[in-house]
């Protein structure tokens, strides 16, 4: 169900000396700008394009055709979202910024380790370091796409090494059913084979920061009966 007009915010695009506005759900608009597949109909509070949303002054089909090459309000709305700016409230901007920072810090926690210890830095420590170095985070850009730049900045105050680990695992047949899907969530299966007793043997490549979590999950799934061996550590 689309957001109500009173809770929507304005997305605005100034182009060729003209201004076009739409009323949008701020959070779905953010997701759309990040590149997520969000139907435009769900983002819009109303299926109209305005010259001035506050006054209710709608853009004519002729104006839209001239500037955008189409009079379809949904297609025009997509262009406004992609190229324009979403007018967030101060609270929305603050909430989205904190959420994005935590997403980035969590990714770094999973993929990077402290080279002095081989263990990942806690998320809160990474967040504090981000504040210390004054990392600039883009609310409307996907978290994954910002990680490398953030890591470069953090290395001024926080020792970090991007690391992947390859682990050999053997899971007894009686636990394979419950383990198969869960294990694959951690990383990429590089090689696998099945034993005559139904056991599952495989090599999995996982981010260095989730190694401990991976072992804990395996133990829970197999009641401690999984066999593991660290085969390779790869710094990136």
UniProtKB/Swiss-Prot annotation:
SUPFAM superfamilies according to UniProt: EF-G C-terminal domain-like (SSF54980), FYSH domain (SSF89895), Hypothetical protein AF0491, middle domain (SSF109728)
The record's annotation in InterPro entries points to: EFG_III/V, Ribosome_mat_SBDS_CS, Ribosome_mat_SBDS_N_sf, Sdo1/SBDS, Sdo1/SBDS-like, SDO1/SBDS_C, SDO1/SBDS_central, Sdo1/SBDS_central_sf
Alphabetical GO biological process terms = cytosolic ribosome assembly
Q: Which family does it belong to?
A: Belongs to the SDO1/SBDS family.
The entry's protein name is Ribosome maturation protein SDO1 homolog
Report the source organism: Pyrococcus horikoshii (strain ATCC 700860 / DSM 12428 / JCM 9974 / NBRC 100139 / OT-3)
């Amino acid at each position: 169900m689309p957001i109500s007009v009173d809770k929507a915010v304005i997305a605005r695009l100034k182009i060729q000396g003209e201004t076009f506005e739409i009323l949008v759900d701020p959070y779905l608009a953010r997701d759309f700008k990040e590149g997520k597949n969000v139907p435009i109909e769900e983002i819009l509070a109303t299926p109209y394009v305005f010259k001035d949303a506050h006054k209710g002054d709608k853009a004519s089909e002729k104006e839209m055709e001239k500037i955008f090459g189409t009079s379809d309000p949904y297609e025009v709305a997509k262009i406004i979202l992609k190229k324009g700016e979403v007018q967030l409230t101060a609270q929305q901007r603050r909430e989205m910024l904190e959420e994005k920072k935590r997403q980035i810090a969590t990714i770094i926690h999973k993929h990077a380790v402290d080279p002095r210890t081989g263990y990942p830095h806690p998320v809160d420590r990474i967040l504090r370091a981000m504040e210390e170095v004054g990392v600039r985070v883009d609310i409307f850009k996907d978290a994954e796409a910002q990680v490398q730049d953030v890591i470069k900045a953090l290395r001024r105050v926080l020792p970090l090494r991007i690391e992947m680990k390859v682990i050999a695992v053997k899971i007894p047949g009686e636990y394979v059913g419950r383990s198969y899907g869960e294990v694959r969530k951690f990383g990429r299966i590089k090689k696998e084979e099945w034993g005559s007793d139904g056991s599952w043997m495989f090599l999995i490549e996982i981010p260095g920061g989730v190694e401990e979590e991976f072992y804990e999950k395996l133990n829970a799934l197999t009641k401690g009966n999984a066999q593991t061996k660290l085969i390779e550590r790869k710094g990136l």
